[in-house]
Amino acid sequence: MNIDVGRQSNGQGHETVHAGFPADQSGLSADRIQMFCSDRGRNAQGDDTSGPGSAAIRANAPRAAVDRMIAAFTSFLAQEMGVAEDVVEFDGETFWAPGSNLTPTMLEAMEMARAQGRTDLQRHAARAGLPDSSLPDGANISEIVIDPEAGQTDQVRYTVVDDFGNLINLMSAEGQVNGGAAQGLEQTMLERVVFDAEGRLLTVSFLGCALPRASRVPMIGITTEPVPLAQNQLGMNGSGEAGAAGAPVAVANAVQDRGIRQVDMPFTPSRIWEVLRDVSEAAEQ
């Protein structure tokens, strides 16, 4: 089975995630399913991955297409079995009907249709529109230690609890949260673009900008508390932006807990040291 979806995978694991439900629905093993993501040579419609909508929107389309495929083969096999269409059942592994000894799997049904030249059973398409709403929820907890003498801020523990609705693949969801949180933490602590007085760019590489560093990102504790969403068939919410969106706010609140009322990101040692000095001087007056 080839599955074409109109969204490009850039490391999010669409080829694994989007194939999961069709495999379960059709009874085909994973090695029988091949994913094509936003391939304009095969599908005229497609775009990149942006926003947390790939699962909540796009995953419903392959599911609907497989439902149509099952319905089409049910009709085809009813004729082969010599029974009424409404008595043919597909139990996730085989088609069957009372009074018939014919019990083909989905793959066997496909081979039967091909042998009879039924090309109309080779392609099944479906659209998935935007859900009425997507309501992911969660909490990010940042625990930091600030060295007042140097202004150094160290992230010692980071905990995330998220509700993304039903999860297709827990490992993929946790990976996105992990990577997003690492990006958000580094954005909060170091990421910036600096120009000199003449407008020349000083942060000309990722060493200065900067990319997340493993030494600065703690082990991130992730817990999921899924509540199925009623607005789409699969009960899923988006998850792609959760880690990156929650981290800056959590760290900023942790910094404020030190008595710092206002400081612009990134929270570099020099900025934190200057603000702590001002706080100390104000307290002495």
Model-derived regions: residue spans:
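Cofactor-binding beta-sheet edge motifs in enzyme active sites
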Residues: M1-Q285
